[in-house]
Amino acid sequence: MEPRMESCLAQVLQKDVGKRLQVGQELIDYFSDRQKSADLEHDQTLLDKLVDGLATSWVNSSNYKVVLLGMDILSALVTRLQDRFKAQIGTVLPSLIDRLGDAKDSVREQDQTLLLKIMDQAANPQYVWDRMLGGFKHKNFRTREGICLCLIATLNASGAQTLTLSKIVPHICNLLGDPNSQVRDAAINSLVEIYRHVGERVRADLSKKGLPQSRLNVIFTKFDEVQKSGNMIQSANEKNFDDEDSVDGNRPSSASSSSSKAPSSSRRNVNLGTTRRLMSSSLGSKSSAAKEGAGAVDEEDFIKAFDDVPVVQIYSSRDLEESINKIREILSDDKHDWEQRVNALKKIRSLLLAGAAEYDNFFQHLRLLDGAFKLSAKDLRSQVVREACITLGHLSSVLGNKFDHGAEAIMPTIFNLIPNSAKIMATSGVVAVRLIIRHTHIPRLIPVITSNCTSKSVAVRRRCFEFLDLLLQEWQTHSLERHISVLAETIKKGIHDADSEARIEARKCYWGFHSHFSREAEHLYHTLESSYQKALQSHLKNSDSIVSLPQSDRSSSSSQESLNRPLSAKRSPTGSTASRGSTVSTKSVSTTGSLQRSRSDIDVNAAASAKSKVSSSSGSPAFSSAAALPPGSYASLGRIRTRRQSSGSTTNVASTPDSRGRSRAKVVSQSQRSRSANPAGAGSRSSSPGKLLGSGLAGGSSRGPPVTPSSEKRSKIPRSQGCSRETSPNRIGLARSSRIPRPSMSQGCSRDTSRESSRDTSPARGFTPLDRFGLGQSGRIPGSVNAMRVLSTSTDLEAAVADALKKPVRRRYEPYGMYSDDDANSDASSVCSERSYGSRNGGIPHYLRQTEDVAEVLNHCASSNWSERKEGLLGLQNLLKSQRTLSRVELKRLCEIFTRMFADPHSKRVFSMFLETLVDFIIIHKDDLQDWLFVLLTQLLKKMGADLLGSVQAKVQKALDVTRDSFPFDQQFNILMRFIVDQTQTPNLKVKVAILKYIESLARQMDPTDFVNSSETRLAVSRIITWTTEPKSSDVRKAAQIVLISLFELNTPEFTMLLGALPKTFQDGATKLLHNHLKNSSNTGVGSPSNTIGRTPSRHPSSRTSPLTSPTNCSHGGLSPSRLWGWSADGLSKPPPPFSQPNSIPTAPSHKTLRRSYSPSMLDYDTENLNSEEIYSSLRGVTEAIEKFSFRSQEDLNEPIKRDGKKDCDIVSRDGGAASPATEGRGGSEIEGGRMALDNKTSLLNTQPPRAFPGPRAREYNPYPYSDTINTYDKTALKEAVFDDDMEQLRDVPIDHSDLVADLLKELSNHNERVEERKGALLELLKITREDSLGVWEEHFKTILLLLLETLGDKDHSIRALALRVLREILRNQPARFKNYAELTIMKTLEAHKDSHKEVVRAAEEAASTLASSIHPEQCIKVLCPIIQTADYPINLAAIKMQTKVVERITKESLLQLLVDIIPGLLQGYDNTESSVRKASVFCLVAIYSVIGEDLKPHLAQLTGSKMKLLNLYIKRAQTTNSNSSSSSDVSTHS
């Protein structure tokens, strides 16, 4: 036996850490076995060496695992030796005291446990404490704190009778002045615990200690709180302590004397837990505050303070507004006395209690208080911070989700309080966050919390994981869905956190996360290293199935704490009373009979072991720790959450789970992800026993009509209804007569129970077992239930929820916001999710959903988080489908959001849904979107050139088709023309093809009158002509040719005139194309019916009356050549109807083929009787006419007045006949009966161009006018430089200048190429700007401006400088033209100040100076103010200098009005780090003073004394240098 003991000693004394870890468990087993270690008690020397080795080498090891093993071995020795271990206490105590200050929480806790065990089994507590008193003066603050905690634990475990407290209290009093706050807090808690056991004598004795009165007050307040709580141990036995007995006297107190009158109640049977648990449980309801230490507050303190405010009354909304404005004024200025600020915060609570939330304007004013709340939360006065936190908590608890904006705004500020060393501030912040998390379930709070989980502060990280755990316990699953990935990533980081307590909290979070999203949790689990996986499992095991306890009772301490928890933790969000807790759970077990459930939301296999015998596939064994628990254990009960009870949701027992234990409802979106891993409960939020399908009717009564067989046939789908996690009432055919009650807390659920009782937490309200329906086993369920087919129409949905339509009418037709405190109106409500109700193609009955707040939907759409944008789009779809029209302001904001969404990077997730929403939006609001059409059309066309998935591209095409059919054709056409010539756009080949195809399809539907020969049209047509020779793409070439032919066919006369105005090269290209087209079409020899096939009839057939008249006499019904060309199917014998039958000509190709091919040979003309000679003569006529027209059009341009005089002379008859003016001398030719449409075209080209258009437009033709409707559109919608001819009139333009400018523009469009040529072009343009060529500017100004601004980004600095010089010259000569482009020009000019080349900067400064003197002062200042406030150096400097020049031009009255906008930016500039910016700001202020004088002074109140002195100095200097000063206070005034 002797050698065995020596070998143990050798193993203990070895230094190798690995071997120690191996032999540790063996030593424990050896010492625990009395037979093997019989020699342990015989050799005292060996035992001494053994214990000494354990104490010095193991317990003092640097490896915490060795330390824990050493303690376990000592614990085994204590158990083995009992009181014989007393001799070793002196050996081990120094090491154990040191370990009380260990950095590892697990080491400290095990150390406490071992010490308590020694006191319990080896020696009496006083013996041990006599040797531990030195720990109160230990150099490690954690050790000093640990000693206090150990004392508390000893008092709880052994009682006060076993200790001579008179020896200990002085040491505790010394620690009250400890430099470390945690030690001070622990000391106070120790005194409180002594008071709890001993009674009032402690108060009297402490008064004799000479402690500072402030410290005594804090301690005595704690004493009073404990006394009021009813947790006193010795209150009944206080008479046993004589007056002369003292806990601090020279002789032992009666509590510690052996002859104590109080009976010694043995407390050794108390289960030994961690010190923190013992402490928190013993202090009852004050546990959290006591745990935090002196000055700390908890939720109960907050709840008491909610009502502890003066009573006020609100008489009107005006009264409320005035009160809040006063409060805001006080809170926004920290110069007010702190007591005033505290009273103001209390008054907010008073207003809330007086019913402020019932007033409409309250929430508007509440938003304005955000800044004041932030300031209060940052206050240096702890009392102000405390009141601010209490007020925020009160707002959250009263307003619920309506406090979303305030909560989101203030949360980051509150987080900054957590690491504060002042406990009152830190704990106030913590409690405020907890209250907000409990009551305001806004998904936007999740990123705020998760971002702080990676804080550098350990305290913040710990708290954040606590908050996350609370959030996962309290919130509904749908509120978490959009942040699944963020939550998983945060929990993963927490599990790897450097701090042990943070890791523990993160592991709790993991299991909370698992209860919501089992699949993601399993995925996360498998990504962890094995050691972390073991830690997660051990956390579950060590918690003694505490994870599976009902949520209302889950805590880190004994059940006493949960009984004494603050009321707020137990009440429902609506303020109802405490939940029924575990008693309900117990009752429900008996009620449900055999339906005892396992913890299936943790264990994916648990459903298989439940009594319902549901077959399911096996999940990961890693999560099966709860599966083996007996049916009657806590784990077999449903999880009753305080805030998430299921009052009877139905679960499809037979839904087939996948390998991850989740129902395979594939069409269900992410928003329908199951909270439970249990296949049988995959659609539900809670695991309450009453949740199984067999549950019958609430109260036993049927609430809806039986489901008919037809509807039953359509509803075999695991589709949620209203509640995105609940299954359909009629998924199982047998439940057809039941109306399954659902928890009213889940979004979109039926309101069959009243609002007052909607939070009923009973898990079993009259549910019956499955056997009642014969559904005890899954085999009895029809196989068709598992088919899981998808509902595709709204009728399916209506049938599936026929009973839901019986809900009270009151709830269906409520206006917005009436019940927005209800969860169904939260921004995360599953009513937002269309997929949570029906398939994408299915309609959603709008009366089945609570409509969402439009502002909330728009906020989601504008979010930077893609999942929130997706949620917003779903909400918007619901709004649009419910025929909810948007206001003008909402429309404007939504258009801005949609404009940004065109560039959304999440194409599959968000952009696809955006396109679907866009189509609905266009259809409903097309009449209000005219101003946004340019952006819509151009962005969609750009998207056609992007690399998109086929499905997404199809949606873009659909959006284009809807756009084409929804807006006026002429407006679309003009936008496309403008887009083509826009120099800022560089469309790729795909975009070009998309544009051309769109124009071609548009041309087939346009009226001839819609084609307008404007400058943009001519420029666009010339560009399209160049595209017909695109070398890189045959698709572009073909599409461009088809567009030219389509436009020619659309309005031959006007298009011919347009060609005549183009340069010769363009004419030749187009004429050649048209010749070939006509030649090819004539060679086909078919009388093409494409007049009705290749061309889609106009939406207004009645307006097809010929828009042009010819001087010729039509012998066939007076039909115009244009009409003959475009619409004749039967030759000239009769005008055909718009929709001729394609089968009128048997040899014609099929309708479908012709429509698809867009073949030029199939366009609209009739060649039935043409021979080749006539064709070529006609072609020659067309060519000659174009050439002649190019000269005539120039003559016409020189006679604008004459043309106007002719305007009324052209008379157009309804049948297409015309009376030509007598003065018209140009060759009108007669058309004989045998001549064809082509000759009519030729003859038309030989006539005088001017014609009056009939119908709505009633305008004459001229080559340069632009559509009036488009002008209006441009002014209102397009701030950027687009081609707006609002000032366009006919001018006398010399032909050489027009051609020259066109060539220059073409040259300038070669960006970053041909540097020398472009320099020459810019110099030439510089000359033209100095000449008085008004016509050039009328036609080309916008194109020139755009090209110049684009050239400012050129690679060559000399080009950039030259462009600025040209721009400056145009500003000098044409200032009025910049009115609509001021913002763009100013921005580009100011940005040029950042250039690295001095030459460019100098040119930019000159241009800015000219801008300041050219543009209207008020307009200029409105553009400059935001730039000054937001831009960085040097742009802000240039803007301030420019503003200074503008101020010198402005009138006093105008400047006074704009002062509110100007001053903030200048004051900001006065504080700038750049001295030049500060100087410029001062000069600008001086210039303002020169204009308005002393009126400036009130706006400078924020300036410090030194800055005011400096400003006054400059003002005086300016006054003295200006001899023309009108007065001492006004240096100069400018009108």
UniProtKB/Swiss-Prot annotation:
Tissues/organs with expression: Highly expressed in brain and heart and at lower levels in kidney, lung, skeletal muscle and testis.
Q: What is its main location?
A: cytoplasm
Q: Does the keyword Transcription regulation apply?
A: no
Which stretches does the entry tag as region Localization to kinetochores? 1253-1535
What single Pfam family name could you report for this chain, choosing any that match? XMAP215_CLASP_TOG
Q: Where is this region: Interaction with PHLDB2?
A: 1251-1535
Q: Which GO MF term does the entry hold, naming one?
A: microtubule binding
The source's domain of life comes to Eukaryota
Q: Which SUPFAM superfamilies match?
A: ARM repeat (SSF48371)
Glycoprotein in keyword set? no
The Polar residues compositionally biased stretches are 267-279, 645-658, 721-730, 1079-1094
InterPro entries noted in UniProt: ARM-like, ARM-type_fold, CLASP_N_dom, HEAT_type_2, TOG, XMAP215_CLASP_TOG
The similarity annotation says: Belongs to the CLASP family.
User: What is this protein's record name?
Assistant: CLIP-associating protein 1
Q: Which organism is it from?
A: Mus musculus
